[in-house]
Amino acid sequence: MSSGLIKTKTIVGIDYSLNSPAVCISTNGGTAFSDCYFYYLTSKKKHIGKMLENVIGYEHKEWKSPIERFTNLSGWVLHILDTLHKKQKNKHVFIEGYSYGSKGQAVFQIAENGGILKYRLQKRFTCKTIVPSVVKKLATGKGNADKQKM
């Protein structure tokens, strides 16, 4: 038998976007709502602050260039992992993959934003990308669930 130490997994789920990114952290490996902490960025003043004990909204920082915007967004994620949850070790990071529904210039900005986050994360954490249909299937039972069902 081992020394009795149990290595608890810290599971990190990231739904990364330009306008409303969110991070969910389960500090004990559980999947119940009460086992998790939820963080999100918003531009709406009424959604900033502690909504529930484990749900906290942060305001987007001002930015002057796309790179500054992407750096702010990825920095916010790293702040959550490194500062708010620094005690939790053994972090397993999962990022929802691209949905491919965007068009035009947004496609490039979404890709650049995601690339910067993944680059910064992979320097310190093991990251895995999960395709949106798998996330939807786990959450609703249907891989093609719409936003309302999610």
Language model features: what each stretch is:
Residues 2-150:
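Phosphate- and other anionic-substrate recognition elements at nucleic-acid/protein interfaces
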